[in-house]
Amino acid sequence: MRIALCIEYDGASYHGWQSQKDVTSVQEELEKALMVVANEPIEVMCAGRTDAGVHGTGQVVHFDTNSVRKLPVWMVGVNANLPKNIAVRWVKEVNEDFHARFTATARRYRYIIFNNRQRPAIFSHGVSHYHETLDADLMHEAGQYLLGENDFTSFRAVRCQSRTPWRNLIHLKVTRHGDFIVIDIKANAFVHHMVRNITGSLIEVGRGKQKPEWVQWLLEAKDRKLAGATAKAEGLYLIDVDYPKEWDLPRVPLGPLFLPDN
């Protein structure tokens, strides 16, 4: 049988999603917890591999198992065996045509900046700190130049292994909530470091060093060296993954924390 899960995790303690030798990963911890409940080796596939320090509130995974368990048993049993900074949000049995990565039609991220002269003490690993005042409205205006299907070479990590830099950016919104600035971005898929590289360039606009139109120029230039620095990992969250409606997967608040879904 094939099971799909949605999980959330605080990525600050992990060297990313993917299992790696001699370091702790989210995948490793999840597979260990699943093996306790299944009483057999388990390998999971995820919708999007997050880097070291990146968080998730809506990561979707699937796994195959010969063990027959009721869905509440998977939910409670796996959560009981996970570290406190990883939790299962929902569980659903799916047929073998479902794949967490390849069935997905879009991914959605949020990047959270604590915009204050002083660094935060609480939630310090859950946000990125930027001390200069940022203009969220200008950042939002700049982000609109990236919408649609485009070549994102200027916002792609040098070592990105994707076969093509073309992605369809569906939604990008920048809003301010007191001292917090939230960059909400959705695309069919993302090249490596795309959200963090876009964020780094939007910060340049927000601090008044560049005009919003500069982002359009960057996109057309197709040169990573011209764009802003890669933003830190701490403020980034994978919050949602879209699938065709026929899969009827559960929906939960996107978060993180108090942030509204829209």
UniProtKB/Swiss-Prot annotation:
Substrate binds at residue 109. It holds the Pfam family PseudoU_synth_1. Disulfide bonds: none annotated. The keyword tRNA processing applies. The active site is at 51 (nucleophile). GO terms for molecular function: RNA binding; tRNA pseudouridine(38-40) synthase activity. InterPro entries: PsdUridine_synth_cat_dom_sf, PsdUridine_synth_TruA, PsdUridine_synth_TruA_a/b_dom, PsdUridine_synth_TruA_C, TruA/RsuA/RluB/E/F_N. Its EC number is 5.4.99.12. Keywords: Isomerase, tRNA processing. It is an enzyme of class 5 (isomerase). Belongs to the tRNA pseudouridine synthase TruA family. Formation of pseudouridine at positions 38, 39 and 40 in the anticodon stem and loop of transfer RNAs. HAMAP family: TruA (MF_00171). This is tRNA pseudouridine synthase A. The lineage of its organism: Bacteria, Pseudomonadati, Pseudomonadota, Gammaproteobacteria, Vibrionales. The gene is truA.
